[in-house]
C-alpha cells in the first residue's frame, strides 16, 4: 500500500525546474522514468506532464531512505522533497539539464507492475497493446504534447469566436433519426418501447433552429457519431467545431473562418497563414487534379488531350472521345527512367479505380518509347508531347474512358506518384484552398435518384434554382470546403431558409411531401416564422489537431479511440448486456444465420 500525502503539497512541476530555482526547497511528484546507481549515488529520472527532472539521493541520507530509493522501479509514483542544485554534468538535451533535485525526503505513493509498453517517445508497439493500455500510452511525452496542442487549439478557437460575438451553446445528443447519408447510432427508449433516439451525426438542424431563434451567432465544440466503415482518419465518434451565423452570405462565412484559422495556427504553432485563402471551383479542382480536395503542395496538373487525339489512329482514344468521355494525362518529370515493371504496377493501380488501362510515353534521350507510338504519326506524337508540356526525361501517363473514371483514376495516380517520388518537398508547408460551387446533387444510377452532395439543407446558387425542375444535375450549391494539404479540414454552406424551397429540395431528392414532413416537419414548421438568411461551417477538430501535431493517424489525437472495427480494446466495448436490461427496453437479440457453406 502506498504512502499517504499527509498534507504534503507539490510546489513545482518536474519539467519546470531551472537555474533560477537553485537553492530553493521544493516538492515534486510524478512517475519514475529510470532508476540507476552510480558510484554509490542513486539517480532517479522523475517525469510528470511538463518533463523530466533528475533526482539524486546522496549516501549521507541514511540507509533507510537509500534502500527505499533503490527499491523503486519504473512507473512507481513518488513524491520527493529536496533542494534544487546545479548539476555537475550538464545535459543539454533536457530543458532541466542544468539542475537536479538533491533529495531529502521520499514517499512512495504507489507501486507499479512491469509496464506492458515502454513509456518513451517513438514507441514501436502493436496498436492493440497501445489501445488496451491507453492510460500508459498517454503517459508518453509525445502523446502528452499532442493533447497540450489540442487544449491550446480549443482555447484559441473559443477565444476568437467569443471575441467575434459567438455564443457557445449546446444541442441535444439524444435526437431523432433522419437517415440520409451515414448510418445512425440508435439508442432504444425505455419509456417508449419499440422507439429509438439517434446520436447526432452533426448538430445541423438544431443550429439552424438556433438561428431561427434569433441567437445570431452560435458555436459548439461537439461530439458527433457516424456508424460507418472506418479509415485511418475516421472514428465512430469524433469532434466538430460547429458554427452558424445569421444575416450572412457565403463570403462572410468564409472570411470569418479564414481569420479563425489564421488565429489558431498563429497561437498554436506561431505559423502565419496567408489570407485571403485562394479559391477554386469544384469543376476546376476535378478537371485539374481529379479531386475535390486537391493537394496543392506539388504541381502535376491533369491535361485534357481529347481534342488532340480525337481523330488519331488509336481506337481506344477515339472511341472514348466519341462516346462522350475524354482522354487525359499526367506528366511525371524525370519519369522516363522508370522500368516497365514499375509502369505496369501503375497500370494495375489505376484499374482499381475502374480505368481499363494506362497508356504511357517515355521521352528518352534516344527518342520516344511507347507501346502506342505506332498508332500515331510523328506530328501527332509531337502534339501530345507539346500539349502535355513534356520534355526529354519525362514520362507521360494517359487514361481514356468516361470522364468520371478518367478524373478519379488520374487524381489517385497523381497522389500515388507524389508518394512514390516524394513530390512534396516541404513537408512543413500548410497549403490551404477553398473549393466552391459544388454540385448540389449527385445521381445514383443504381437507385435511379438524386442524393444531396452535402446535405438536403444547402442553398442552391440563385441563378441555378430554375433548373431544379428541369435539370437538377446542373444545379450548383452555395457550398464551400476548406482543404489543407489534400485533406478536407472543414465544410459548410449557406442554408435554405424558405419552406417552399426546402420542400422542393426534398421533392427532387425523392421524398413525398408526407415523408418530408414526417422526418423534417419541425424544421419546415420553424421556417414559417421569419427565419433569417443563415449559413455556417464545421471543422473536424480531430483532423485539425492531426495537422497541428504532425501525426497522420486520428487515433493519436483522441484520448480513448476505437480501432478500425469500432472496438475499444481498453473497455472491450461494445459488449453483451444483461437479458434483464434488454427485456426492460423491449429488445430481443436475434442471431444472424450462418451463411457459410
From Swiss-Prot:
Output the Pfam families linked to this UniProt entry: GAD (PF02938), tRNA-synt_2 (PF00152), tRNA_anti-codon (PF01336)
Record keywords: Cytoplasm included?
Answer: yes
The cross-references to PROSITE patterns, in alphabetical order and at most eight, read:
AA_TRNA_LIGASE_II
The subcellular localization recorded is: Cytoplasm
Could you tell me the Gene Ontology terms of the biological process aspect for this record?
Answer: aspartyl-tRNA aminoacylation
Question: Which UniProt keywords are listed?
Answer: Aminoacyl-tRNA synthetase, ATP-binding, Cytoplasm, Ligase, Nucleotide-binding, Protein biosynthesis
Q: Which reaction does it catalyse?
A: tRNA(Asp) + L-aspartate + ATP = L-aspartyl-tRNA(Asp) + AMP + diphosphate
Please tell me which top-level EC class this enzyme sits in. ligase
Residues holding ATP = 226-228, 235, 488, 540-543
EC number annotated for this UniProt entry: 6.1.1.12
Family matches, as InterPro entries: Aa-tRNA-synt_II, aa-tRNA-synth_II, aa-tRNA-synth_II/BPL/LPL, Asp-tRNA-ligase_1, Asp-tRNA-ligase_1_N, Asp/Asn-tRNA-synth_IIb, AspRS_core, GAD-like_sf
Q: What is this protein called?
A: Aspartate--tRNA ligase
Q: Name one GO cellular component term.
A: cytoplasm
Q: Which residues bind L-aspartate?
A: 180, 226, 454, 495
Q: Which family does it belong to?
A: Belongs to the class-II aminoacyl-tRNA synthetase family. Type 1 subfamily.
Sum up the protein's function in the record's words. Answer: Catalyzes the attachment of L-aspartate to tRNA(Asp) in a two-step reaction: L-aspartate is first activated by ATP to form Asp-AMP and then transferred to the acceptor end of tRNA(Asp).
Entry annotated with the keyword ATP-binding: yes
User: Where mainly found?
Assistant: cytoplasm
Q: Which organism is it from?
A: Clostridium perfringens (strain SM101 / Type A)
The molecular function terms of the Gene Ontology recorded here are:
aspartate-tRNA ligase activity; ATP binding; catalytic activity, acting on a protein; nucleic acid binding; transferase activity
Task: Quote the subunit structure annotation.
Answer: Homodimer.
Q: Where is this region: Aspartate?
A: 204-207
Amino acid at each position: 500500500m502506498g504512502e499517504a500525502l499527509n498534507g504534503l503539497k507539490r510546489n513545482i512541476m518536474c519539467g519546470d525546474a531551472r537555474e533560477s530555482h537553485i537553492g530553493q526547497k521544493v516538492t515534486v511528484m510524478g512517475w519514475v522514468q529510470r532508476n540507476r546507481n552510480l558510484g554509490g549515488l542513486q539517480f532517479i529520472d522523475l517525469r510528470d506532464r511538463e518533463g523530466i527532472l533528475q533526482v539524486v539521493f546522496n549516501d549521507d541520507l541514511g540507509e533507510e531512505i537509500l534502500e527505499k530509493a533503490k527499491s523503486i522501479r519504473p512507473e512507481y509514483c513518488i513524491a520527493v522533497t529536496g533542494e534544487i542544485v546545479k548539476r555537475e554534468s550538464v545535459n543539454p538535451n533536457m530543458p532541466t539539464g542544468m539542475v537536479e533535485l538533491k533529495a531529502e525526503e521520499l514517499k512512495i505513493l504507489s507501486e507499479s507492475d512491469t509496464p506492458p509498453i515502454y513509456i518513451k517517445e517513438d514507441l514501436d508497439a502493436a496498436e492493440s497493446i497501445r489501445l488496451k493500455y491507453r492510460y500508459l500510452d498517454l503517459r508518453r511525452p509525445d502523446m502528452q504534447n499532442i493533447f497540450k496542442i489540442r487544449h491550446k487549439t480549443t482555447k484559441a478557437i473559443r477565444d476568437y469566436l467569443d471575441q467575434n460575438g459567438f455564443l457557445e451553446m449546446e444541442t441535444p445528443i439524444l435526437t431523432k433519426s433522419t437517415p440520409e447519408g451515414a448510418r445512425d447510432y440508435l439508442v432504444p427508449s425505455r419509456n417508449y418501447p419499440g422507439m429509438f433516439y439517434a446520436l447526432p451525426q452533426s448538430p445541423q438542424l438544431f443550429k439552424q433552429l438556433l438561428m431561427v431563434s434569433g441567437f445570431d451567432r452560435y458555436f459548439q465544440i461537439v461530439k458527433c457519431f457516424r456508424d460507418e466503415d472506418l479509415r485511418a482518419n475516421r472514428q465512430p465518434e469524433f469532434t466538430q467545431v460547429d458554427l452558424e451565423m445569421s444575416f450572412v452570405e457565403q463570403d462572410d462565412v468564409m472570411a470569418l473562418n479564414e481569420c479563425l484559422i489564421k488565429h489558431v495556427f498563429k497561437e498554436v504553432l506561431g505559423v502565419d497563414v496567408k489570407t485571403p485563402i485562394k479559391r477554386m471551383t469544384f469543376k476546376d479542382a476535378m478537371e485539374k487534379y481529379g479531386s475535390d480536395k486537391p493537394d496543392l503542395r506539388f504541381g502535376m496538373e491533369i491535361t485534357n488531350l481529347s481534342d488532340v487525339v480525337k481523330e488519331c489512329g488509336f481506337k481506344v482514344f477515339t472511341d472514348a472521345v466519341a462516346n462522350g468521355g475524354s482522354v487525359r494525362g499526367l506528366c511525371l518529370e524525370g519519369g522516363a527512367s522508370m522500368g516497365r515493371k514499375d509502369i505496369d504496377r501503375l497500370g494495375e493501380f489505376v484499374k482499381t479505380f475502374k480505368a481499363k488501362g494506362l497508356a504511357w510515353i517515355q521521352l528518352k534521350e534516344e527518342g520516344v518509347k511507347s507501346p502506342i507510338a505506332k498508332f500515331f504519326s510523328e506530328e501527332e506524337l509531337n502534339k501530345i508531347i507539346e500539349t502535355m508540356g513534356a520534355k526529354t526525361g519525362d514520362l507521360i501517363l494517359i487514361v481514356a474512358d468516361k470522364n468520371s473514371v478518367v478524373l478519379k483514376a488520374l487524381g489517385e495516380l497523381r497522389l500515388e506518384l507524389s508518394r512514390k517520388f516524394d513530390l512534396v518537398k516541404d513537408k512543413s508547408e500548410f497549403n490551404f484552398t477553398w473549393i466552391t460551387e459544388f454540385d448540389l446533387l449527385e445521381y445514383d444510377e443504381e437507385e435511379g435518384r438524386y442524393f444531396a452532395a452535402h446535405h438536403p439543407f444547402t442553398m442552391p446558387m440563385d441563378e441555378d434554382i430554375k433548373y431544379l425542375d428541369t435539370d437538377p444535375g446542373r444545379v450548383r450549391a452555395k457550398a464551400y470546403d476548406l482543404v489543407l494539404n489534400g485533406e478536407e479540414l472543414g465544410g459548410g454552406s449557406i442554408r435554405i431558409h424558405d419552406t417552399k424551397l426546402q420542400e422542393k429540395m426534398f421533392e427532387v431528392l425523392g421524398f413525398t411531401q408526407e415523408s418530408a414532413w414526417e422526418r423534417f416537419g419541425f424544421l419546415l414548421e420553424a421556417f414559417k416564422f421569419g427565419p433569417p438568411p443563415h449559413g455556417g461551417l464545421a471543422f473536424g477538430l480531430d483532423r485539425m489537431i492531426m495537422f497541428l501535431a504532425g501525426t497522420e493517424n486520428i487515433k493519436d489525437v483522441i484520448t480513448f479511440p476505437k480501432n478500425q472495427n469500432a472496438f475499444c480494446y481498453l473497455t472491450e466495448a461494445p459488449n453483451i448486456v444483461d437479458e434483464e436490461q434488454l427485456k426492460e427496453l423491449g429488445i430481443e437479440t436475434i442471431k444472424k444465420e450462418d451463411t457459410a457453406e
